[in-house]
A protein has these predicted regions:
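Short glycine/proline- and aromatic-enriched beta-strand/turn motifs that initiate or cap beta-hairpins
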Residues: 22-74, 238
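Bacterial Sec-dependent N-terminal signal peptides
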Residues: 1-27, 237-239
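Gram-negative (and chloroplast) outer-membrane scaffold detector with strong preference
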Residues: 34-38, 46, 50-52, 81-162, ...
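Extracellular/periplasm-exposed beta-strand and loop segments of Gram-negative cell-envelope proteins
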Residues: 50-73, 101-127, 155-180, 210-230
Length: 239
């Protein structure tokens, strides 16, 4: 799913949610939804991914390397949802899924002829993710409620280039570790429609470990620590 398709889907579902919410004064949709302990559903998401970068303390940009710039790239997520409701307005959510992420680093160099040249090094990943989130929700008002999220995620990069042979690949690769752990936080809104609950949520993930593999090349030498950062906008469908 590209960004344009996601926006069309978002607008369509927002109109559907608004229609359902407008009827809140007439009737309350799925009134027994919160009385059930377990709920299941799925999420469709768009993401934007980049890095937190720390440079080596003894490194200074020289006449050749002028700078390194983060270039966030777009991607998407597909996930299943299992939710346990132990007490009112508190949910424990397990959201396993796939996250297709793309990150970019722009390296700017000054060549011998005083010409500025930029090289974009991209790191593409397909993460198998296992997030566990705590959802804290407000009381339901008609067919609407707001909520906050906090939790963590363990991920395995199914497309990791950690062990790639650069001699065979024919290029220098910025290699990343195969696993990552993130701290996630965000919030959203629930709309209770006639047959299911629809949610819109925004979430940010902060990597907790250094994922950069030091290969001793010109692209990794200036960097001491590199952690992932991801922003996710999701549409949640829950029954």
């Amino acid at each position: 799913m590209n960004i344009r398709s996601f926006i069309v889907l978002l607008v369509s579902t927002l109109l559907l949610a608004a229609s359902g919410h407008a009827q809140s004064n007439a009737r309350e949709n799925i009134p027994n939804f919160d009385s059930r302990k377990y709920h299941f559903g799925f999420l469709l998401s768009a993401n934007s991914s980049s890095f937190f970068i720390d440079y080596k303390p003894d490194f200074s940009f020289n006449d050749s390397l002028l700078g390194i710039e983060n270039v966030p790239q777009a991607g998407f997520n597909l996930a299943l949802l299992a939710s346990f409701n132990p007490i009112k307005n508190v949910n424990l959510r397990f959201v396993p899924g796939l996250s297709f992420q793309d990150r970019g680093l722009n390296y700017t160099y000054l060549s011998d002829g005083n010409k500025v040249e930029t090289y974009l090094k991209r790191t593409e990943s397909v993460w198998l993710q296992f997030p566990l989130m705590l959802k804290l929700r407000t009381n339901r008002v008609g067919n609407f409620a707001a909520y906050g999220l906090i939790g963590g995620c363990y991920g395995i990069d199914m497309q990791s280039q950690k062990d790639v042979n650069e001699a065979i690949a024919g290029k220098i690769v910025v290699k990343l570790e195969k696993t990552d752990i993130t701290l996630d936080a965000g919030g959203g809104f629930d709309f209770f429609l006639p047959y299911f609950k629809f949610g819109i949520e925004m979430k940010t993930g902060f990597g907790m470990k250094n994922v950069l593999i030091q290969d001793g090349n010109q692209f990794t030498d200036p960097i001491s620590n590199m952690r992932t950062r991801t922003f996710v906008l999701s549409l949640c469908f829950e029954g």
